[in-house]
Amino acid sequence: MQLLKDRIRKDGIVKQGNVLKVDSFLNHQMDIELINEIGKEFKRLFEKEKITKILTIEASGIGIACIVAQYFNVPVVFAKKAQSINIEGEVFATKIESFTHKKTYDVIVSKKFLKPSDRVLIIDDFLANGCALVGLIDLVISSGASVEGIGIVIEKGFQSGGEIIREMGIHLESLAIVDSMNAEDGTVVFRGDK
Amino acid sequence: MQLLKDRIRKDGIVKQGNVLKVDSFLNHQMDIELINEIGKEFKRLFEKEKITKILTIEASGIGIACIVAQYFNVPVVFAKKAQSINIEGEVFATKIESFTHKKTYDVIVSKKFLKPSDRVLIIDDFLANGCALVGLIDLVISSGASVEGIGIVIEKGFQSGGEIIREMGIHLESLAIVDSMNAEDGTVVFRGDK
């Protein structure tokens, strides 16, 4: 998605350790106009999948998922990072390791909101090692629903998550795949760039 | 807002301890169509305030704030619950006590995203004791920006938050104010009900 790549080049900040900061437009301050364009693009890419529900994970996926959901006319469900699982039995639960925060979360979705008949589109802002996505896929499978697609705003193509998910045979679309970045001169190379 | 009150009566669940669960349409599963109507109503209520930015706090406020922001054509900034404040100097920070989770969070907003010229509308799903809101107001004041309004979806009118905020002279609008609820028969009494 050219608009997104242009914006990453303009306002993204490359930091040491392969960190790409997009907090001025995507995950701290949010440019709603840009995210609407992202919503239209996901609609185009997943139009045929007869999506009934959009699933994401708190926190930074929620706003994107809500804007995207308008183009599919379906509800959003966001998985919660649980303090403790004391609602056993009423929820689907999984564990997700966060490398950013160096801890493991219990992540839950109420059984009321994922049903075997649901055709789920998973939406998230970033895909790196894929831990969060694998956890979300696990929640959907637990419910008997199907993962009909995964829409990612920015994929770090040099990490393994994208490959893991694609090898599962899931329809994954990333609107910008970063193949490399350089913290010294701030440049970003996207997959498909000449 | 009648549509919202009707929905709370229909799908809200009253639990012991003055807990009102609205997780089927507002803060776990999200009914985007309803939230669009909420957005239109906030636009009507705060139309004159020349809002330049919407501020909320993760996690459940984010989706609502993003949908609402579309009616104001402004960006959303969400305050983050910090793991630790190791970015001192670059952020406005405050502490917010959560009674639900029985802990105190450091809450931060990057200094890049709140400027003295900003006219801020704060959006959140619930107002009870007001701790989260007072923290967000504190962040805005730290930045030199002005709080032009606060839009709340559901206020627990029998808790002190609403009174505290209104006594500050801030333009607070709650779309549904619950004056009492009864866990035994599941009834909810809204302010203004006959």
Curated annotation (Swiss-Prot), chains A, B:
5-phospho-alpha-D-ribose 1-diphosphate binds at residues 128-132. The keyword Nucleotide-binding does not apply. It is found in: Cytoplasm. InterPro entries: PRibTrfase_dom, PRTase-like, Pur/Pyrimidine_PRTase, Xanthine_PRibTrfase. Its EC number is 2.4.2.22. Xanthine binds at residues 20, 27, 156. GO terms for molecular function: xanthine phosphoribosyltransferase activity. Pfam families: Pribosyltran. One of its GO terms (biological process) is XMP salvage. One of its GO terms (cellular component) is cytoplasm. Keywords: Cytoplasm, Glycosyltransferase, Purine salvage, Transferase. It is an enzyme of class 2 (transferase). It catalyses: XMP + diphosphate = xanthine + 5-phospho-alpha-D-ribose 1-diphosphate. Pathway: Purine metabolism; XMP biosynthesis via salvage pathway; XMP from xanthine: step 1/1. NCBIfam families: PRK09219.1 (NF006671), XPRTase (TIGR01744). Converts the preformed base xanthine, a product of nucleic acid breakdown, to xanthosine 5'-monophosphate (XMP), so it can be reused for RNA or DNA synthesis. Belongs to the purine/pyrimidine phosphoribosyltransferase family. Xpt subfamily. Homodimer. This is Xanthine phosphoribosyltransferase. It comes from Lachnoclostridium phytofermentans (strain ATCC 700394 / DSM 18823 / ISDg) (Clostridium phytofermentans).
